[in-house]
């Protein structure tokens, strides 16, 4: 069975998008101070600026007609949970929970998947160790063609599991 998730590419009309707000992902300046260097950020995020940028982006998405789904906080998530594209893999049949290459991000797919599943979006699979796969390394060309980059976040085993 296939579902209409809209465009499975990076240039078509965006119908639905799942985002986590900076207020949820970053939570507080204290949390930013405790995590940003451990997570290898180049500089310290500015919580207030990030919140303002998010409001602007969300307004643009809303004006374009996209349905914005706000992802919740989750125990053990880090600042990186703001970058939702990495921790979500959408296919024509539903979501696949990836296995993040960065160990600090491994809880994100479960939290994201559980929330989206509660909204009626099916979770059809999960990448298991030793596979690694991140949405940021994947680009849909059309509904049947997916390009995958192999590197420290996505490996051949993760791609093999996704292809099943």
What residue spans do the PLM features occupy?
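The feature marks the mature, well-folded catalytic cores of soluble enzymes
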Residues: 1-164
């Amino acid at each position: 069975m296939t579902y209409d998730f809209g465009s499975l590419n990076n240039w078509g009309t965006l119908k639905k998008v799942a985002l986590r707000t900076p207020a949820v992902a970053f939570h507080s300046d204290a949390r930013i101070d405790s995590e940003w260097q451990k997570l290898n950020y180049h500089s310290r995020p500015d919580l207030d600026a990030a919140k303002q940028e998010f409001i602007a982006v969300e307004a643009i998405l809303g004006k374009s007609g996209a349905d914005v789904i706000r992802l919740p906080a989750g125990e053990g998530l880090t600042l990186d949970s703001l970058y939702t594209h990495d921790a979500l893999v959408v296919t024509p049949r539903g979501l696949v929970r990836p296995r993040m290459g960065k160990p600090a991000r491994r809880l994100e797919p479960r939290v994201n998947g559980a929330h989206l599943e509660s909204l009626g979006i099916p979770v059809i699979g999960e990448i298991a160790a030793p596979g690694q796969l991140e949405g940021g390394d994947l680009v849909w060309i059309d509904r049947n063609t997916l390009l995958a980059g192999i590197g420290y976040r996505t490996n051949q085993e993760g791609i093999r599991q996704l292809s099943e």
